[in-house]
């Protein structure tokens, strides 16, 4: 973990008409497992395929078809649990969650209510202002995804696409440790970052591969601390669940809107009803979807078609030994080994591809110089072209070559930016480009002195002003750089200007 000290962020406080109120948030995140096949069938999980083309007999609940568990999905769930510093349960079991919906052909969902595969873990959520909160993970269980109902193809009929039916989901359940909309979004972002590093979920929210159910309640200041001391939920308000959120921006908006709705109800003397709600971003409101069900409403019972899932500790240990360096550890290493600021290290570890790129550029070079060029020059140029690091036309070796030329005083900083632009747009070896195009820095003090003498002779008035006010000597530095096409060594120029005007 990061060897840094963080302050806890202050909880979000919303002023009601009568009192101040704090927010308490817990999240159930549904992450689609990165796997080529579904949880209990060999059908493809490819996104965007023709409707009902990725459906096995077991997905369609054909009579006599039995589920067969996909070992790779189990491995991905274990890998995710290990990445979240969670306990792995060597014995887990599947249960049937019974409910009727057109896109659920079995009439039940196979899940893990009583014995999940992953137990308690934790996630460090940083907010970018020097504060961070450790959010506790209660459990992770595997379950089947449902299909998709389509209502906009025909005015009189609805259709069902079963391609998604049976795809493996990991439901990551947090404790009610999140205290504001920004924290909720940061928590989702951190989970996505970790799972992308692990390769267990691509985190694509637009495709529905990562979505969240957000549980929101309100309490008076001080009540949450009593809950922490006693773990007694009666100190907290009644929670409402906002279902199927697939946008961090909408998650923040929905939490704020729902909290204000609850505050208005309580301050008017009413009681908040526990229910499931939907967020309407167009109207900026949540609306009731259904009363919040409890576990007994779904008549859970052990799935008779599936044996308990037993895994060996040696198998778990083998998976653990092959885990990649995760974001927190990578960030700590960048700060320690390269002397980076917390901010720069956060930017460079935001995604795995950027971290790998920086690692390659910084190897054997100044980490701070490498970070400056990757973040300010490369990322800035990529953003301008609406590209990401995977589309970079400049390889780590090429950018490293530019940095080497700067470090060896072969080129100046100004020329380096021109060189970078050439490499970005045309490609090529930086050192060769410098040689062929005559871009090498002028280090011959005789040539620099000759240029400076000409400028001094042509500008006697500026010389007198510079002698009276040494800060104006910078004008002469600029003129020399201009006269040499930016090739003069800035350090040598400054020394000569100071000598002649001092």
Curated annotation (Swiss-Prot):
EC numbers, comma separated: 6.3.5.-
Tell me what this protein is called.
Aspartyl/glutamyl-tRNA(Asn/Gln) amidotransferase subunit B
Give the protein family. Answer: Belongs to the GatB/GatE family. GatB subfamily.
- Fetch the Pfam families from UniProt: GatB_N (PF02934), GatB_Yqey (PF02637)
Q: Which organism is it from?
A: Ruegeria sp. (strain TM1040)
GO BP annotation list:
glutaminyl-tRNAGln biosynthesis via transamidation; translation
What does the subunit comment say? Answer: Heterotrimer of A, B and C subunits.
Q: Which gene encodes it?
A: gatB
Q: Which GO terms describe its molecular function?
A: asparaginyl-tRNA synthase (glutamine-hydrolyzing) activity; ATP binding; glutaminyl-tRNA synthase (glutamine-hydrolyzing) activity
Q: Which reaction does it catalyse?
A: L-glutamyl-tRNA(Gln) + L-glutamine + ATP + H2O = L-glutaminyl-tRNA(Gln) + L-glutamate + ADP + phosphate + H(+); L-aspartyl-tRNA(Asn) + L-glutamine + ATP + H2O = L-asparaginyl-tRNA(Asn) + L-glutamate + ADP + phosphate + 2 H(+)
């Amino acid at each position: 973990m990061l060897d840094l000290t963080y302050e806890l962020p202050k909880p979000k406080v919303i002023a009601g008409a009568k009192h101040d109120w704090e927010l308490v948030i817990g999240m159930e995140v549904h992450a689609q497992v990165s796997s080529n096949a579904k949880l209990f069938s060999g059908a493809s999980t490819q996104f965007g395929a023709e409707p009902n083309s990725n459906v096995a007999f077991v997905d369609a609940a054909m009579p006599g078809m039995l589920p067969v568990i996909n070992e790779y999905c189990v491995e991905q769930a274990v890998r995710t649990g290990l990445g979240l510093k969670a306990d792995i349960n060597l014995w887990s079991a599947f249960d049937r969650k019974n409910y009727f919906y057109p896109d659920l052909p079995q009439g039940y969902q196979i899940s893990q209510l009583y014995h999940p595969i992953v137990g308690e873990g934790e996630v460090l959520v940083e907010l970018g202002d020097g504060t961070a909160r450790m959010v506790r993970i209660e459990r992770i269980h595997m379950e089947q995804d449902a299909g998709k109902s389509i209502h906009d193809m025909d005015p009189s009929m609805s259709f069902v696409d079963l391609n998604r039916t049976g795809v493996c989901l990991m439901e990551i359940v947090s404790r009610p440790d999140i205290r504001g909309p920004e924290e909720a979004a940061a928590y989702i972002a951190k989970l996505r970052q970790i799972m992308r590093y692990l390769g267990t979920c691509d985190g694509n929210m637009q495709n529905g591969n990562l979505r969240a159910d957000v549980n929101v309640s309100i309490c008076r200041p001080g009540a949450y601390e009593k809950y922490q001391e006693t773990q007694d939920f009666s100190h907290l308000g009644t929670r409402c669940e906002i279902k199927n959120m697939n946008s961090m921006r909408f998650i923040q908006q929905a939490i704020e809107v729902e909290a204000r709705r609850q505050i208005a109800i309580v301050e008017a003397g009413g009681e908040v009803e526990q229910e499931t709600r939907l967020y309407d971003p167009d109207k900026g409101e949540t609306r009731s979807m259904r009363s919040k069900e409890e576990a007994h409403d779904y008549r859970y019972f052990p799935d008779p078609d599936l044996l308990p899932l037993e895994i060996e500790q040696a198998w778990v240990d083998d998976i653990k030994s092959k885990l990649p360096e995760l974001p927190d550890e990578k960030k700590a290493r960048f700060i320690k080994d390269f002397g980076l600021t917390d901010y720069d290290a956060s930017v460079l570890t935001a995604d795995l591809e950027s971290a790998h790129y920086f690692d390659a550029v910084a190897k054997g070079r100044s980490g701070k110089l490498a970070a400056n060029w990757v973040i300010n020059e490369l990322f800035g140029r990529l953003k301008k072209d609406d590209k990401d690091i995977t589309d970079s036309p400049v390889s780590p070796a090429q950018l490293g070559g530019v940095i080497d030329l700067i470090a060896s005083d072969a080129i100046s900083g100004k020329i380096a930016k021109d060189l970078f632009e050439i490499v970005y747009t045309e490609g090529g070896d930086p050192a060769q480009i410098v040689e062929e195009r005559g871009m090498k820095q002028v280090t011959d003090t005789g040539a620099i002195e000759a240029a400076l003498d000409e400028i001094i002779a042509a500008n006697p008035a500026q010389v007198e002003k510079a002698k009276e006010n040494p800060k104006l000597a910078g004008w002469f530095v600029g003129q020399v750089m201009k006269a040499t096409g930016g090739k003069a060594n800035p350090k040598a120029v400054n020394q000569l200007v100071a000598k002649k005007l001092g």
